[in-house]
């Protein structure tokens, strides 16, 4: 009996430890800015490390906003590109740190936000689909985007 405990106790301890999180950076802020506004000639800082105005020559072509929300346990960095009227033209996940739930980066899931404005409901289960296996991440990113859309109304 003691031999069984001597072998199973360490194995149980190792197996009970949660998997380590891993951070994956998919895009940097400058890469995401260029992806969202390929015709931009300049990104003017509106708020340091958070909001930029995208310009093509002297014309404002939109706004680029960086934000961070908590997933289940760790942060998710994402960006939103808005057209001058305040409608979403692109959402990108820049860095995802959880060890599971990476489906949050799915192009079809992110595409649900395109064209939405502050007047849109932006609610998981209403106009935004939930992601099984990334429930908290999908809710928190959606809530973050809704919060940013409220703030962005002041940029127009």
Question: Where are the language model's segments positioned?
Answer:
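Flexible, solvent-exposed loop/hinge segments and secondary-structure transition points
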Residues: 19-129, 135-139, 143-156
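Bacterial N-terminal signal peptides
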Residues: 8-16
């Amino acid at each position: 009996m003691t031999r069984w405990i001597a072998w199973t106790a360490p194995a149980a301890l190792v197996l009970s430890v949660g998997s380590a999180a891993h951070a994956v950076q998919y895009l940097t802020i400058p890469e995401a800015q260029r992806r969202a506004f390929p015709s931009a000639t300049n990104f003017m800082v509106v708020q340091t490390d958070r909001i930029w105005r995208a310009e093509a020559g002297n014309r404002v072509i939109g706004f680029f906003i960086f934000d961070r929300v908590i997933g289940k346990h760790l942060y998710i960095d994402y960006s939103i590109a808005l057209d001058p009227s305040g409608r979403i033209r692109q959402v990108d996940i820049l860095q995802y740190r959880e060890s599971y739930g990476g489906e949050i980066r799915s192009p079809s899931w992110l595409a649900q936000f395109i064209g939405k404005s502050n007047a849109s409901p932006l609610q998981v289960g209403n106009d935004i689909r939930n992601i099984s296996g990334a429930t908290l991440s999908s809710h928190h990113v959606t809530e973050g985007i809704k919060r940013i859309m409220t703030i962005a109304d002041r940029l127009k």
